[in-house]
């Protein structure tokens, strides 16, 4: 991992959709997590929002930086009222969690409505300095309906304020990904 760090790597990504929760506080995960925290890397997680109450506490207790992918994937039916999404919001003041604004289409037919309702809540909970945008390219399973330019245009519809967009597009990722400024 140290070799990867010297090459500019800044984190790992876990796609946990449809997979069991890792036991971050046990054995090899605990050791691996300690190394990731020591390197000041992030752990980007794609998981259904109902899982945040179980996933986040052990990671935050170890001092990990976490990026919740796709607005935290709020439940397609309950949207921003989803208890898992609310649990994600409750971690905003820790300073250890970022949320990636990406892939509204992954929240079903009402995805755009859900993320438009989610953005003000995320902004209030995390501040724009802990929100980053992602194109979600190559849009797996949605290649025929989504393009990088459509994904970028979607951000403009979610985040109306130009200064907030600037922070989300440049300042927050520069800090998270350790880009020189």
How would you label these PLM feature ranges?
Residues 1:
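Catalytic cores of alpha/beta
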Residues 4, 8-24, 141:
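Glycine-rich phosphate-binding "P-loop"
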Residues 11, 25-132:
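Catalytic pocket-lining loop regions of alpha/beta-barrel enzymes
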Residues 106, 139-141:
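Short, active-site-adjacent cap segments at secondary-structure transitions
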Residues 121, 126-132, 141-181:
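Mid-to-C-terminal alpha-helical segments outside catalytic/metal-binding sites
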Residues 136:
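Active-site glycine-centered loops adjacent to acidic/histidine catalytic or metal-binding residues
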């Amino acid at each position: 991992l140290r070799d990867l760090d010297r090459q500019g790597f800044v984190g790992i990504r876990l796609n946990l959709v449809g997979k069991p929760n890792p036991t971050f506080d046990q054995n090899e995960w605990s050791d691996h997590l300690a190394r990731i925290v020591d390197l000041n890397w992030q752990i980007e997680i794609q998981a259904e929002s109902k899982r945040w109450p179980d996933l986040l506490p052990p990671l935050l207790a170890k001092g990990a930086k976490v990026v919740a992918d796709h607005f935290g994937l709020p439940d397609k039916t309950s949207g921003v009222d989803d208890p898992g999404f609310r649990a994600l919001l409750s971690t905003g003041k820790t300073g250890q969690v970022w949320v990636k604004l990406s892939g509204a289409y992954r929240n079903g037919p009402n995805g755009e409505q859900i993320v438009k309702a989610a953005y003000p809540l995320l902004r209030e909970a995390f501040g724009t300095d802990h929100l980053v945008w992602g194109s979600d390219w190559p849009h797996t399973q949605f290649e025929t309906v989504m393009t990088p330019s459509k994904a970028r245009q979607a951000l403009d519809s979610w985040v109306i304020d130009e200064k907030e967009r600037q922070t989300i597009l440049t300042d927050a990722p520069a800090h998270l990904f350790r880009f020189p400024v």
